[in-house]
Amino acid sequence: VVVAGAGNAAMSAAVSAAEAGAKVIVLEKAPEHLRGGNTYFTGDFRFPWASVEDLAPLVPDFSDAEAKGIRETCTPYSQTDFYDDVMRVTEGRSDPELLELLVSQAFPAMQWMAAMGHTWVPSYANPTASMPLALNGGGATLSDHWFDVAARKGVEILYDHQAIELLPDSAGEISGIRVQTPAGYTTFHTK
């Protein structure tokens, strides 16, 4: 599996593929010290949740005081709320089928990320129903942790490697990817 990019979505895909037994290469166009793109600057995640008890497994040592704080400042955020918010901010341009997939899998994705060792803290600075938690350590920690997990799972990361073009075979299936490297252009072939 070849993954283009090394932000949160890309690293999630890379780790998931490695967990499924695939050999994974991540192509990161940035040098190592700038890796991860905009993930470095993120802090919050929007996901549906039904109760404070849903949030507890995402927060290490979740205290009664933290639970009380969320109960007092936030209301549950349903899948319908999430769906409607995305449709509202996109002015109805989101693909309904893909959006339904996002909405239905957002909380399971959070649980999976927690199983990978990511953690959150209550977000009292921005206590909205849709984002009651913030990343523990922010985006920099999220990014660094993904790279640690990927290394443990055997994911190969190639820095200064920019994906340029997907290469289809005669049947239209993607059979490779053209990549710009410090040494010039190369092609990675897929199976």
Would you name each region that the model predicts?
Residues 1-9, 25:
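Beta1/beta-strand and adjacent pyrophosphate-binding region of the FAD-binding site
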Residues 17:
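Aromatic pocket-lining residues of Rossmann-like dinucleotide-binding sites
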Residues 29-156, 160-165, 172-173:
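Conserved N-terminal/central alpha/beta ligand/cofactor-binding core
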Residues 30, 182-183:
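Glycine-/small-residue-rich beta->alpha transition segments that form the dinucleotide
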Residues 176-181:
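Short beta-strand segments that buttress and anchor functional surface loops
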Residues 183-191:
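Core beta-strand elements of the Rossmann-like FAD/NAD(P) dinucleotide-binding domain
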